[in-house]
UniProtKB/Swiss-Prot annotation:
Its EC number is 6.3.5.7. Heterotrimer of A, B and C subunits. InterPro entries: Amidase, Amidase_CS, Amidase_dom, AS_sf, GatA. SUPFAM superfamilies: Amidase signature (AS) enzymes. It holds the Pfam family Amidase. This is Glutamyl-tRNA(Gln) amidotransferase subunit A. GO terms for biological process: translation. It comes from Burkholderia thailandensis (strain ATCC 700388 / DSM 13276 / CCUG 48851 / CIP 106301 / E264). It catalyses: L-glutamyl-tRNA(Gln) + L-glutamine + ATP + H2O = L-glutaminyl-tRNA(Gln) + L-glutamate + ADP + phosphate + H(+). The lineage of its organism: Bacteria, Pseudomonadati, Pseudomonadota, Betaproteobacteria, Burkholderiales. One of its GO terms (cellular component) is glutamyl-tRNA(Gln) amidotransferase complex. Belongs to the amidase family. GatA subfamily. Allows the formation of correctly charged Gln-tRNA(Gln) through the transamidation of misacylated Glu-tRNA(Gln) in organisms which lack glutaminyl-tRNA synthetase. The reaction takes place in the presence of glutamine and ATP through an activated gamma-phospho-Glu-tRNA(Gln).
Amino acid sequence: MHAKSLTELRAALDAKECSAVELAQHYLKRIDAARDLNAFVHVDAELTLAQAKAADAALAKGEAGPLAGLPIAHKDVFVTRGWRSTAGSKMLANYASPFDATVVARLSAAGMVTLGKTNMDEFAMGSSNENSAFGPVKNPWDTNAVPGGSSGGSSAAVAARLAPAATGTDTGGSIRQPASFAGVTGIKPTYGRVSRYGMIAFASSLDQGGPMARSAADCALLLNAMAGFDERDSTSLERADEDYTRHLGKTWAAGGDAGKPLAGLRIGLPAEYFGAGLADDVRAAIDAALKTYETLGATLVPVSLPKTELSIPVYYVIAPAEASSNLSRFDGVRYGHRAAEYRDLLDMYKKSRAEGFGPEVKRRILVGTYVLSHGYYDAYYLQAQKIRRIIAQDFQEAFKSCDVIMGPASPTVAWDIGAKGDDPVQMYLADIYTLSVSLAGLPGMSVPCGFGAGANAKRPVGLQIIGNYFDEARMLQVADAFQRATDWHVQEPAGV
């Protein structure tokens, strides 16, 4: 059952080959048997089965939503009524939200059944899921390796078939990089396409929720439910709803040749994504994927994104600045961790934050406070915002000669747990290919396209596909065509 896609699972439910309750029980057993991966931080079988029973009742009455009875795991950055919502932090270890995030509410309204909350880097700050207050997550493909971050629990859960789908968030690559490391498909939509209401904030001008699943087709189904305007989110874009599945299985050009379904598609290859720092085994997997696209009829076009190397310093000015502001609310007064002993109010603030936040979160708060301080705001923050606009302009210039941009999602495959913990800069450099997409607010996704070599032969490689604003449906079409021609996305870790 766990090898089936969302479409196949829904067909099984409609044909009464299984019930939503039986499906939920199946996945709950798998989650329990895979505790060692540490992919989940909160599972409540009673809550899950109650939702599954409601889905079965709706299916029986013919009143079911489009995703009725299908299980999903939620990244623990989305507040969820009835479940703890921790953001991977001791600061919120016992926080119970009185409401659902819009993403959770929309998927629930479509009939999905929540399996639990997945582990993550604390407040979504990290690239390895080692920054969680609840311990690191292991990569199902190689348990010595990280699953990526910050949505590492979600990527591991989908890869290990503990859930057929999961939600994630992407601030600088936190859907795409873990999807790459764990061999699953994940998409970060255009900024503002998916509501941030109820998503615990890291960097408000960058955070964006999105789906993670086995395939592009599954992600399209999920995005149909997740995307849309939300008046409760001031950054939500008012735009007509669309069907993200509408191009799947169709030729790129109307009336095109089914034997060359992507004839007419122009794929931009930035020179900056294939230079120094890209591991040979990753380059080989990406090159092979691009050859597959050529056999499908696509044309490869050289493009340039000259400010790519500036995306890391720009991101690590803007994101920490916004984080320092967003996280100032956690002071031990209204909610969150409060120190047990303190002398006065100021001491309570200091001790509560010192005890509640982990090292990486503290580091970014300090950096953010510094760049926003008097005398440095103009030199750092305003300058970073100017370069951010130039980065976005570079993409628009590139899109004049191509329809999508492709390259690696990460310069390497997943590294060993603990390998980069003492050198945060090396961890930051791992996001070189994803940060600029987030800074520009563009949609981007990662699809499995191979594995590393030698000692890394069990560690997946992800191909990043970048589209122009609101081009998600076309990107999903491009990814789906690749997945119809290859089987990387259906391969499973040993023992699954």
